[in-house]
């Protein structure tokens, strides 16, 4: 059982994979026939950027909303499905500071342990500080972007202006 992300890049049991991509790319992954053939758990935070984009004949997913990191940890520890997909929600990870940041690493360790028995995919639309901590423990990290985001175009270099001169020197 494997989900194909790109030619030569698969999500399979025994491997914890992190995917950073636009939501539409994950929708395409979720529409693969393998998702319907195997029990699939989809964990998301307060809201999902992906679930609303699925068509009406969406695959069968066991959905689990996790409002806190601790709820996410509990859901992952109880997971028995063949495929586990976690939608990263920066809203539940960003408030963690100081000693609470250890909880992020606990999530990463739990995802890695779960990958021994299931295909585990962590998805995020972009990287941030909390996600970087989760990426450290991933077996493979896939960044998938077809186009450059609109704001990523480098601004044109400005010409150097001549040194200012006083009015007396200009005349």
Regions found by a protein language model. Give the residues of each.
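N-terminal regions of ATP-driven nucleic-acid and macromolecular assemblies
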Residues: 1-171
């Amino acid at each position: 059982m494997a989900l194909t992300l790109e030619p030569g890049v698969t999500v399979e049991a025994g491997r914890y994979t992190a995917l950073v991509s636009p939501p539409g790319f994950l929708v395409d992954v979720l529409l693969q026939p393998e998702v319907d053939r195997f029990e699939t758990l989809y964990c998301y935070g307060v809201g999902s950027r992906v679930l609303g984009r699925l068509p009406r004949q969406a695959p069968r997913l066991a959905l689990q909303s996790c409002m806190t990191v601790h709820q996410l940890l509990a859901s992952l520890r109880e997971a028995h499905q063949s495929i586990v997909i976690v939608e990263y929600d920066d809203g539940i990870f960003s408030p963690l500071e100081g000693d609470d940041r250890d909880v992020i690493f606990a999530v990463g360790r739990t995802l890695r342990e779960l990958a021994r028995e299931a295909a585990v995919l962590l998805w995020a639309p972009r990287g941030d500080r909390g996600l970087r901590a989760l990426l450290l423990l991933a077996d493979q990290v896939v960044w998938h972007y077809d186009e450059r985001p609109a704001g990523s175009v480098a601004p044109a270099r400005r010409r150097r202006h001549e040194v200012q001169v006083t009015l007396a020197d200009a005349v």
